[in-house]
UniProtKB/Swiss-Prot annotation:
InterPro entries: METHMP_CycHdrlase. It comes from Methanospirillum hungatei JF-1 (strain ATCC 27890 / DSM 864 / NBRC 100397 / JF-1). The lineage of its organism: Archaea, Methanobacteriati, Methanobacteriota, Stenosarchaea group, Methanomicrobia. Its EC number is 3.5.4.27. Belongs to the MCH family. Pathway: One-carbon metabolism; methanogenesis from CO(2); 5,10-methenyl-5,6,7,8-tetrahydromethanopterin from CO(2): step 3/3. It catalyses: 5,10-methenyl-5,6,7,8-tetrahydromethanopterin + H2O = N(5)-formyl-5,6,7,8-tetrahydromethanopterin + H(+). It comes from the Archaea. It holds the Pfam family MCH. It is found in: Cytoplasm. This is Methenyltetrahydromethanopterin cyclohydrolase. Its main location: cytoplasm. Keywords: Cytoplasm, Hydrolase, Methanogenesis, One-carbon metabolism. Catalyzes the reversible interconversion of 5-formyl-H(4)MPT to methenyl-H(4)MPT(+). It is an enzyme of class 3 (hydrolase).
Amino acid sequence: MISVNELALEIFDNLANYSEDFNVAYHELDNGAKIVDCGVSVPGGYAAGRAFTEICMGGLGEVNFRMGQIKHVPMPFIEVSTDYPAISCLGAQKAGWTVKAGNYFAMGSGPARALALKPKHTYEVIGYEDESDDAVIALESDHLPNGEVMEKIAKDCGIDVENLCAVVAPTASLVGSIQVCGRCVETAVYKLNELGFDTRKITAAMGTAPIPPVKADATKAMGTTNDATIYHGQISLTMKAPDIVDFLEKIPSNKSKGYGKPFYEIFKEANFDFYQIDTSLFSPAEVTINELTEGKVYHVGEVNPDVTLKSFGYL
């Protein structure tokens, strides 16, 4: 069985050993837990963003960058691919762990979830569970975790705290922008899972999304990074699943009730209460599917350059 934690550990060790080259900072706490700051007190960068995103995917995804443009505006794009979509996206990358300890709060993702089974139902659905003495977690937070936080995470993972590694980046940072946009494929896989589709039938996946400019405000940064996928995420899925025809029209974001406005505006209208937002909005803009059993192709959704540029501040 593939170990997402063992694969991610190799990437983490590279970040830690060459922290200066990556514009990040390595810290080892008194209890032996290891942390790489990718944007809290350091600039980070594209190389760090690639490593952070690949760690989130449990070492089962590949990340690249390119320059593209939306209408007349040039901007960077992320490209993500994986040959293990269910495990890498749902079993690792999904931000399925709310980390709380004392006054500390962070959204947790990455392969450590596969040890702590956060949430357990996800791993039952995809039929995956990791076995590893080491754990690697990715934390989306403005602050680095202390020893108490790392102790709690290690306990939930069932490992010794000195074998726990964490990468940390704020939403409002370059690495933060990169890693959230790097979830473009995950949003498609997650949406299909929520619709009741067996995501283990997806054999390969690839996606791209624009990387938005970093906002000074964390809530606005959350808006732009979500909009990158909601309004301009383009995904290609390869699968053996003739029954995909029953799910097609519900995949893209333009089928949700909140579609058509930048996410920050929707969030503000909902009094910044996530529970008032139609969760079907968290989907890619456009998806193509190659169904191998019958050799058919499908295309749903479309990008929305105007809302994307408005969200990013160019309109």
